[in-house]
Amino acid sequence: MGNAGSMDSQQTDFKAHNVPLKLPMPEPGELEERFAIVLNAMNLPPDKARLLRQYDNEKKWELICDQERFQVKNPPHTYIQKLKGYLDPAVTRKKFRRRVQESTQVLRELEISLRTNHIGWVREFLNEENKGLDVLVEYLSFAQYAVTFDFESVESTMESTVDKSKPWSRSIEDLHRGSNLPSPVGNSVSRSGRHSALRYNTLPSRRTLKNSRLVSKKDDVHVCIMCLRAIMNYQYGFNMVMSHPHAVNEIALSLNNKNPRTKALVLELLAAVCLVRGGHEIILSAFDNFKEVCGEKQRFEKLMEHFRNEDNNIDFMVASMQFINIVVHSVEDMNFRVHLQYEFTKLGLDEYLDKLKHTESDKLQVQIQAYLDNVFDVGALLEDAETKNAALERVEELEENISHLSEKLQDTENEAMSKIVELEKQLMQRNKELDVVREIYKDANTQVHTLRKMVKEKEEAIQRQSTLEKKIHELEKQGTIKIQKKGDGDIAILPVMASGTLSTGSELAVGNYVGSVPGATTSGPSVPPPPPLPPSSDTSEAAQNGTASPPMSPPPPPPPPPPPPPPPPPPLPGPAAETSPAPPLPPPPPPSAPPLPGTSSPTVVFNSGLAAVKIKKPIKTKFRMPVFNWVALKPNQINGTVFNEIDDERILEDLNVDEFEEIFKTKAQGPAIDLSSSKQKITQKASSKVTLLEANRAKNLAITLRKAGKSADEICKAIHVFDLKTLPVDFVECLMRFLPTENEVKVLRLYERERKPLENLSDEDRFMMQFSKIERLLQKMTIMAFIGNFTESIQMLTPQLHAIIAASVSIKSSQKLKKILEIILALGNYMNSSKRGAVYGFKLQSLDLLLDTKSTDRKQTLLHYISNVVKEKYQQVTLFYNELHYVEKAAAVSLENVLLDVKELQRGMDLTKREYTMHDHNTLLKEFLLHNEGKLKKLQEDAKIAQDAFDDVVKYFGENPKTTPPSVFFPVFVRFVKAYKQAEEENELRKKQEQALMEKLLEQEALMEQQDAKSPSHKSKRQQQELIAELRRRQVKDNRHVYEGKDGAIEDIITALKKNNITKFPNVHSRVRISSSTPVVEDTQS
């Protein structure tokens, strides 16, 4: 059917007809065939066709019957013949009056057929045979001819101004002589064809004007526009109308019709065409033609005149204002937009809109406000531009200030980092001193405890001695024992028998220290032990000093045998030394000097952070290639970079280098170089010189020597005395690639022993001869490279070590971070306790999982929740990340490589010292060692502190320092802080959005309550509209709705214009290209 989107309305129209008796349903096969024919005739989109195919047979048969009853009986040529009959100028006026009475009805039937018939009928109407569009446009021109030219005002001069021999249609054709629109291809006829088709129009144009005046009093113009609108609703018809040289012009001329309803219809149609890509230019061209035909002084003059005069017809005023809004503000070029705006300003639009600002029509007020909202105030724009220029200057000034402040901040950060490192050093030193003091205190405390124990034991011994003495005296008084002194100073305790005689057999010898024997007893069980003598003065004195052992203590063990001869290293003395095996020998120290020349590859370069670099073979190209001016890394800079892991030579094997050379070779070159012939020529040319080096190596050496601009003597002398002023370090590193190999040295020495003339050698060979004679060449070149790069290496390594130290200390000492981890641990245990049980800690990589754990509604993550908890409950730790200093810098440091670089520097320094001991007269080495040994020592101290500080903080967080380098440890905190800040921002944004939405809802509720009191139905309708608008804003946002390339697009645009009240236009208006296949139209509503 005609309109692809009007299936339901068509079915309603079908039911409106008088339905005769229902015919019997045919067989299913025949039913499906006829249903397929009906579907093809209806020209429905695929989705609606699929819907109809799902009908049961009963509904399909009803649809077939309705469709067949609805078929238009008149073919297209019937209407075309009737319209041509009205246009025949040979018919008499009386006969014309009789014919034209049914013209409006014929046009109405034609409009219904164009709108409701299948696409085949419309294509037949428009084909080359019928040329229905041409006939319809000609009839429209004829119907409004009298109104357009106002023949009443020019009737008196018609004889002199109108050529009687020219038909009315040809005079209309002349109006479009200046049209530059492209002629339709296959859809319309040329000017000469049009003239030949109208050859029968031979009556004077006076009668034509009178007939046109008669037709203009009817609704024929309005219905003609409806017919053209129905044609334009098809892709095929729309393309024909757009490419027709006069169709749009005639539609625009219809604005002269006196019926405001017709004029509103015309403006709606023209506004819809404006929204099609390329349509705006066609509409402006039509109004240029309107200006010429109607004699306007300015374009749109008649339109503004009708807009002012038809103030009693709101629909026309809304259509006019909407058309003005679209034609002015739907332009891509801003200057052209201002130009169109000024056209209407000159016609008095601004003043008239000021009068209409209090109009009672809401629709008109919306369009007026839309125009005013989109107006460009050039003066204000100029002022804004000037303000912008001033602002840009201010911005530039502020950016410069920011740049200076950034430099100062960087310097301040470096100074602060250095101070932090120094304080950390002092702290570590104080901690070491504290550990020593604690050890001394521990030892002293142990000694004090031992002495107190000894004093206590001595006091107990004295007490026992006093007790024993008392008992001995008592026994002596009782006569039980008798004390007898001997000549040697000992005393004897003799028991007294019952008969009063002494028993000599039981005599006890007691020495000077008898009093100190606590367990001494007599032979008789009833006799108490004799009391000892008082201690001598020596014993008392020793006891007072607290150094003597307790009396009668067991004798000390015999002294250990002398230790065996100590093997290196010697064992510990004592029994442990005798039993424990000797420790293994220490590993041999690293070699103190690199191998001598000839024992290793000449590509080895000894320097900070520099590993063995493989020499890349030079590539011989067939053509001269342009130079790629990249910034190359030095050999000592590729260690640890991505370039250390890639092999470009392998890539070249996969590429088509011949094609590459052909594409990028330099201009003005002959054919490709034959490598074999070129080698022969070189050999012939250099036959007078003897070349001992390999050709490519000699060539590269020559290039390197030319860069230096020094003679061989100067270079060798500078190497001998380590003169880096004469030979820059870059040249030294380049020259190290050409250290003579063992084979080259043999060849050179052989040539020299044979006493061949050196003059026959090439410059490169003579240089290599002299170069190879330098003593310890490899060591000297290595030392020069080391000295030249030492300062740069120190400056590169020191900030990295400082960053590790500062970041480690700040993370370990941050109490706020500790609180954050405590919160995370608590929430994690709460979530996992029912399944996995509580834990006591977690790995740091678990922090990355906070973003993966989402809430039930998927709107926030666990990290968002933690951010909210911290802000609400623990505000004191909200800015915990401010306590983490230099973490990002530390994350970029490879501590392992830095420590290796420090070791390499130490090896280089040792090599330099050894060289200086051999040649202590070299002032350059002396000054270098004097000024830089301290720097290296300080760097080594920083490296030790950095290693210790990092190990401490890694262990502090439960990680293993061996498996967790800084490049893994610190980025965890960097990512966590970044994600935490983003979560804070998103929480704040969501809070603002919820607050704004709540305020909006409260306002809407208050407004709806007011409207509810007035009109409940209005409240319901408004709620629905706001809900739809909100859904569109959320889902579509700034994307414009795109009308698909299908039939019915024009109707969709016009419907959108009526419903949506387009009020906003983008700066760059998007239209759809007009193509002969699929024109797509966009709605501009934002």
From Swiss-Prot:
For region Disordered, the annotated ranges are 520-600
> What keywords are assigned to this protein?
Lipoprotein, Myristate, Phosphoprotein
Q: Name one GO molecular function term.
A: actin binding
Extent of Pro residues compositional bias: 526-535, 551-574, 581-597
Q: Which residues form the GBD/FH3 domain?
A: 23-469
A GO biological process of this protein is: regulation of cell morphogenesis
Q: Mind telling me which InterPro entries this protein's record contains?
A: ARM-like, ARM-type_fold, FH2_Formin, FH2_Formin_sf, FH3_dom, FMNL_animal, GBD/FH3_dom, GTPase-bd
Residues forming coiled coils: none
Q: Which SUPFAM superfamilies match?
A: ARM repeat, Formin homology 2 domain (FH2 domain)
Which positions fall inside the FH2 domain?
Answer: 615-1006
Point out residues bearing the modification Phosphoserine: S188
Q: Which residues form the signal peptide?
A: none
In the record, which residues receive a covalent lipid, type N-myristoyl glycine?
A: G2
* Residue ranges of every copy of the DAD domain listed in the record: 1038-1077
Q: Which family does it belong to?
A: Belongs to the formin homology family.
State the name under which the record lists this protein.
Formin-like protein 2
What is the protein's species of origin?
Mus musculus
